[in-house]
Regions:
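Glycan-recognition/cleft segments
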Residues: 130-161, 215-218
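Short surface loop/edge beta-strand patches of beta-sandwich-type extracellular domains
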Residues: 31-43, 93-112, 169-175
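Extracellular, beta-strand-rich glycan-interacting domains
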Residues: 49-58, 113-122, 231, 243-275
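Short tryptophan-centered beta-strand motifs in secreted/extracellular beta-sheet-rich domains
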Residues: 116, 180-189, 198
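Extracytoplasmic low-complexity segments
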Residues: 21-94, 269-276
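Short, aromatic/His-centered strand-loop micro-motif at the edge of beta-sheets
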Residues: 159-184
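Flexible glycan-contacting loops in extracellular carbohydrate-active proteins
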Residues: 209-251
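C-terminal motif of bacterial Sec signal peptides marking the signal peptidase cleavage site
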Residues: 16-20
Length: 276
């Protein structure tokens, strides 16, 4: 009997040791950046599917870019921290981007909102701001933002969702996106209307012609895998276009959010007014 008791105690201790060694060291949930947006409490399964505030102050760059909804750490973060619109942000380098294993359950969304704060100056690059990776499209991205031909108060601005493009060509996006100040960008898609809306600093920007009517109904993002922030696929060593003209983002970025619903105009304005 004593031998059996001794064996059970040893086995229990061994299980505890193995279990503790197999878990990635993470801080308690209280250490993750909190979301100050009162409209959507931050919890797994809620409307806010992915959110990184870039507010970490650790020497571990992965910790500084962790997603606060599901504690989703990037697999790689080559970018430096910088002063953000609220707390800290990231500074793009034009070459590399942050790679996440997924955007949590955002790929199950049938409507969506993509929101971020950006701060940049005039440059000659064709820059990619983010990519939701998918093998279903020739460019291997189910959503991305491309900006080029920048001037202080105008640029060419292209947003793609399931290979349906809203394009402000020939520098027809006439907003001061490159004046060196912080600006809020948001893109909403509503499955009930099939309309994609673009917002700049809390105000809707009319989409060219009928391009905002994507005609998709419910989105199908189920094939989406990695999320790239601050660049396109090639900047995170993921397959996709590798043309030399494709540059990663060079400015500062903060408060990157993915919602599984189309935010209303007032909800987008609230994000802008609250610097979230």
């Amino acid at each position: 009997m004593k031998n059996k008791i001794h064996f059970c105690l040893v086995l229990t201790a061994l299980i505890l040791v193995v279990s503790s060694c197999s878990k990635k060291d993470r801080p308690s949930l209280a250490d993750y950046p909190k979301d100050a947006d009162p409209h959507f409490p931050l919890y797994p399964g809620g409307p806010l599917k992915f959110y990184t505030a870039f507010n970490g102050t650790s020497t571990d760059k992965l910790m500084n870019a962790v997603d606060s909804v599901r504690a989703n750490f990037p697999t790689n973060n080559p970018l430096a921290s910088a002063t953000g619109i609220t707390g800290s942000g990231i500074k793009g380098d034009g070459v590399k981007a942050i790679k996440y294993p997924s955007a949590n359950d955002f790929n199950l969304s049938t409507s969506c909102t993509i929101s971020m704060w950006v701060n940049n100056t005039v440059n000659p690059n064709t820059e990619l701001y983010f990519s939701l990776v998918s093998k279903d499209y020739w460019h291997e991205s189910s959503a991305f933002l491309l900006v080029e031909h920048a001037a202080v108060d105008k640029c060419t601005f292209k947003f793609a969702l399931q290979d349906h493009w809203v394009e402000y060509t020939n520098q027809s996006f006439t907003k001061p996106l490159f004046n060196g100040n912080w600006h809020h960008l948001a893109f909403t898609y509503d499955e009930t209307t099939s309309l994609l809306k673009v917002y700049f600093d809390g105000v809707e920007v009319p989409t060219p012609g009928t391009s905002g009517n994507l005609g998709l109904g419910k989105l199908n993002l189920k094939s989406s895998t990695n999320l790239v922030v601050g660049g396109w696929n090639k900047h995170a060593d993921i397959s996709g276009p590798t043309d030399a003209w494709i540059s990663a983002y060079t400015g500062k970025m903060d408060q990157f959010r993915l919602y599984g619903k189309a935010l209303s105009a007032s909800e987008v304005l609230a994000l802008y007014n609250s610097k979230l």
